[in-house]
From Swiss-Prot:
Keywords: Cell membrane, Coiled coil, Membrane, Transmembrane, Transmembrane helix. InterPro entries: Bact_Cytoskel_RodZ, Lambda_DNA-bd_dom_sf, RodZ-like_C. Residues 121-183 are annotated as: Disordered. Residues 147-185 form a coiled coil. Gene3D superfamilies: lambda repressor-like DNA-binding domains. The chain crosses the membrane at residues 92-112. It is found in: Cell membrane. Pfam families: HTH_25 (PF13413), RodZ_C (PF13464). Residues 136-146, 154-181 have a biased composition (Basic and acidic residues). It is a single-pass membrane protein. This is Uncharacterized membrane protein YmfM.
Amino acid sequence: MSLDDLQAATKIQKRYLTALEEGNYDIIPGKFYVRAFIKQYAEAVGLDADQLFEEHKKDIPNTYHDDVSEKISGMNLQKEMPKPASKALELLPTILVILGVIVVIAIVYAIIQFANHKNSDDHNAASEKAITQSESKYEIPKDSTLKENQNNSSEKETDTKKETKENEDKKKENDSEKLEIKAAGTEGSLTTYEVSGADKIELELKASDSSWIRVRDENSSSLKEGTLKKDETYKKDITDQKQVDIRTGYAPNLKIKINGKVLSYELDPKKVMAQTIKIVNKKEEKSS
């Protein structure tokens, strides 16, 4: 992967990328950024950042600063002298009386609430019993026409839901069968694909291992940007998009599907690891 590809994938300036590769950490502004840049670099090329930190911990600066002396100097170590407690002792009897009154009030309130709640429960139980007895007088016979109609309605609703699901599954299969994916050409690390033939187009990105991605719509607005973890999947309906650009920092770890069909890389991912995939929707406009 070239420095230009790494810069595009990680957003780190090339001079800092060169410094990372050469182990020249002094030109990077701050120890925190050294570790942050190394982590981004590792993710872009498919390496384990934690393993890198462990193997090169003697060379990579630590973000922890042992500045205990400065922190101690800024602390106020003066101890306050205990204040006279005589005034508090004078108020103690009054405080105890107030607390006692509060406790008594709380107990009385709890007793009243319990009594009201019990009366309410008894009243509700009596009402429910009366309603149950009333309903039992008008219970619908098991063989009545009304119950038969209810059963028929329930069966029809179940059949309708089943038929709707079957139609949806059939439509997805038809879209997948009618879909055509055509490689229109490559330029540098960019490959353009044209898709047509399907009424609905769904994009699916799945990472076999950590892989950074960026997805933009026809207006260059970001739809997704970040690192997909191992076995993580991103899906997006792009039926209404004229085109979608997909940038991957490490193509060997990323599988691209359209309507379930795997898109084959025109550029060998092992040779061109950072790639841009442009999906152009060639769906024909329906005449009015």
